[in-house]
């Protein structure tokens, strides 16, 4: 029986795709690097920032990463005022329903915890969430299972009573690696086929479909 939902943020709860793509592309311009296509950037969503940068520029010297990160965060802070995250349809209402029904709800993201917490507050989701974990709260990020394992340990919930929900294959891989159930959402930054290939137990097209699935695990 599912007692805990561990939710991704970007592409699962909120649409941040335009913000992430435009931030990356503007950082590339400022740093003098070739501007990558939007889809190439979208494919890195869900990875920690540094890993995403190295995926886009495999030959980038590691000593160049701090400047990259600094420029990225400067651009991000500027752009988020104009194209900040928007909740996907039905997210807030569904979280309120799940919370009222007694489910524990947590968030595990590759975003830094200060940014993640700020977005959750701004979007009015904090009343429903009991635990928030960002990239800086673990030593190994998605697709490694550590974010799920730490959440389970801190909340004293066994893996077989948890459902990991995310839009990217790395979310599914993270959940499976921890022994939890997994559910992909097809409306985010990936697609149904990729999520099924990653091993998702279920894939939904709307966040509001999730409550009706829980009794089936």
Model-derived regions, located:
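Asp-based, Mg2+/Mn2+-dependent phosphohydrolase catalytic module
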Residues: 1-3, 96-99, 112-113, 117-217
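Conserved phosphate-coupling serine/threonine residues in phosphotransfer and NTP-handling enzymes
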Residues: 12, 109-111
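Residue-level marker of regulatory loop/turn positions in helix-turn-helix DNA-binding domains and
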Residues: 87, 108, 140
């Amino acid at each position: 029986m599912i007692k805990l939902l561990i939710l991704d943020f970007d592409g699962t709860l909120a649409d941040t795709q335009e913000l992430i793509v435009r931030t990356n592309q503007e950082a590339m311009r400022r740093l003098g690097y070739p501007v990558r296509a939007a889809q190439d950037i979208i494919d890195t969503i869900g990875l920690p920032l540094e890993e995403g940068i190295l995926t886009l520029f495999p030959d980038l010297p590691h000593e160049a990463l701090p400047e990259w990160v600094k420029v990225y965060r400067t651009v991000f802070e500027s752009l988020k005022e104009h194209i900040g995250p928007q909740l996907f349809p039905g997210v807030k209402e569904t979280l309120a329903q799940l919370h009222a029904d007694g489910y524990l709800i947590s968030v595990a993201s590759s975003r830094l915890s200060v940014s993640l917490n700020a977005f959750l507050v701004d979007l009015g989701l904090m009343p429903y969430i009991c635990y928030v974990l960002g990239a800086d709260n673990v030593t190994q990020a998605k697709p490694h299972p550590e974010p799920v394992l730490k959440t389970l340990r801190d909340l004293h919930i066994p893996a077989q009573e948890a459902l990991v929900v995310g839009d990217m294959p790395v979310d599914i891989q993270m959940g499976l690696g921890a022994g939890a159930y997994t559910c992909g959402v097809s409306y985010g930054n990936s697609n149904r086929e990729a999520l099924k290939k990653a091993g998702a137990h279920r894939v939904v097209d709307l966040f509001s479909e999730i409550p009706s699935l829980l009794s089936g695990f």
